[in-house]
Amino acid sequence: MHIAALHQPSQVQLNQDGNLKHFLTIEGLSKENLTKILDTAQSFLDDNNNLINRPLLEGRTVMNLFFENSTRTRTTFEAAAKRLSANVLNIDIARSSTSKGETLRDTLWNLEAMAADIFVVRHSSSGAAHFIAKDVCPKVAIINAGDGRHAHPTQAMLDMLTIRRETKKSFEDLSVAIIGDIKHSRVARSDVAALQTLGCKDIRVIAPNTLLPVGFSEYGDHVRLFNNMDEGITGCDVIIALRIQNERIDSPALSSQSEFYRMYGLNKERLSLAKPDCIVMHPGPMNRGVEIDSSIADGEQSVILKQVTNGIAVRMAVLALSMQGQLQEQGLIEAIAL
């Protein structure tokens, strides 16, 4: 997908009142939409960063449909749904009827007939979640848990919540560096879109040319490209390290992993170029000794494990808000008391 195409707004995910009914992509959502997600997620965390259970989805059924492997995302969605008192079903795609030749459309229609309220979908095809929400199951709340190289909106929102909680600064005042495989990363696309929407004016993308997407220069005035990592991270408030997406690379993009670490690996020496209170993030899974050194991943400036906790809160928020938006759309309720 040409990166400029991601700026086309998608109103499929909003109901007639402008509230979330699906969560498919950051693009097309306003600052107010994103802030509502962050504020709702914040309400599920106490002052000590402990999660707060609320039975907002009691009697509702959430189905996790992961057509790609996942550990953190699937598990945190399950944890989020259970903390909202939902019934959770994890569909084993490898053993489902899709492996027997059934179409995706027929599989989803059958699952919808089982009284599913929310589908959490991860798929290797870009646009899969949008297709399901628009053309297959519009009355089921569809949450995009990652579609190809396109988008990973809940990861972006948990990253934004982590940045907001840990830096205690306005997004307008932050310098954020994203380092690694930008070309194949749905996280990078969604993070950049969320940062732009929330007002960040200094977004630095650091990568070799072979790991940058076509059309990068069209992404926005506040996004700058750096091939030199030392230059790119100097004075940053936030560093987000990304792994190399080997499973999505068709032809060799690097001479070796050791060469990537030498040029772009985050170590103590490089981190010292950022601000003293710079936080270090990573969406996982990490490849230690490739994009990040263990001393940094496990160090005092790392907030990687806090991202995981924040991910549950964000996914609780997205599940609750999307269910509310669907019920509003269908004229069944005015609002859930969030």
From Swiss-Prot:
GO terms for cellular component: cytosol. Keywords: Pyrimidine biosynthesis, Transferase. L-aspartate binds at K100, R186, R243. PROSITE patterns: CARBAMOYLTRANSFERASE. One of its GO terms (biological process) is 'de novo' pyrimidine nucleobase biosynthetic process. It catalyses: carbamoyl phosphate + L-aspartate = N-carbamoyl-L-aspartate + phosphate + H(+). InterPro entries: Asp/Orn_carbamoyltranf_P-bd, Asp/Orn_carbamoylTrfase, Asp/Orn_carbamoylTrfase_sf, Asp_carbamoyltransf, Asp_carbamoyltransf_Asp/Orn-bd. Carbamoyl phosphate binds at R72, T73, R122, H152, Q155, G284, P285. Pathway: Pyrimidine metabolism; UMP biosynthesis via de novo pathway; (S)-dihydroorotate from bicarbonate: step 2/3. One of its GO terms (molecular function) is aspartate carbamoyltransferase activity. Its EC number is 2.1.3.2. Disulfide bonds: none annotated. Pfam families: OTCace (PF00185), OTCace_N (PF02729). Gene3D superfamilies: Aspartate/ornithine carbamoyltransferase. HAMAP family: Asp_carb_tr. Catalyzes the condensation of carbamoyl phosphate and aspartate to form carbamoyl aspartate and inorganic phosphate, the committed step in the de novo pyrimidine nucleotide biosynthesis pathway. Heterododecamer (2C3:3R2) of six catalytic PyrB chains organized as two trimers (C3), and six regulatory PyrI chains organized as three dimers (R2). Belongs to the aspartate/ornithine carbamoyltransferase superfamily. ATCase family. This is Aspartate carbamoyltransferase catalytic subunit. It comes from Acinetobacter baumannii (strain AYE).
